[in-house]
């Protein structure tokens, strides 16, 4: 889910990813189960 994704990004970037990715793309939650478009 989005929280797990945020934890992964925090580990990689050492910053909070939710403010950016919240509008960047829906990974899970709002629109159900979707794949990231960039990956």
UniProtKB/Swiss-Prot annotation:
First-listed, main subcellular location of the protein, grouped into a coarse class: secreted
Gene Ontology MF: a single term: calcium ion binding
TM spans (from-to): none
Record has Metal-binding as a keyword: yes
Localisation: Secreted
GO CC entries: extracellular region
Pfam family, one: Phospholip_A2_1
GO biological process: arachidonate secretion; lipid catabolic process; phospholipid metabolic process
Keywords for the protein's UniProt record, in alphabetical order: Calcium, Metal-binding, Secreted
Organism domain of life: Eukaryota
Keyword Secreted attached: yes
Tissue specificity of this protein: Expressed by the skin glands.
Residues at which Ca(2+) binds: 27, 29, 31
Sequence similarity: Belongs to the phospholipase A2 family.
Function: PLA2 catalyzes the calcium-dependent hydrolysis of the 2-acyl groups in 3-sn-phosphoglycerides.
Protein name stated in the entry: Phospholipase A2 CS24a
Organism encoding this protein: Rhinella diptycha (Cururu toad)
Classification of source organism: Eukaryota, Metazoa, Chordata, Craniata, Vertebrata
């Amino acid at each position: 889910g989005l929280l797990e994704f945020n934890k992964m990004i925090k580990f990689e970037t050492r910053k909070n990813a939710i403010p950016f990715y919240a509008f960047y793309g829906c990974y899970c939650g709002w629109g159900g189960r979707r794949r990231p478009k960039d990956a």
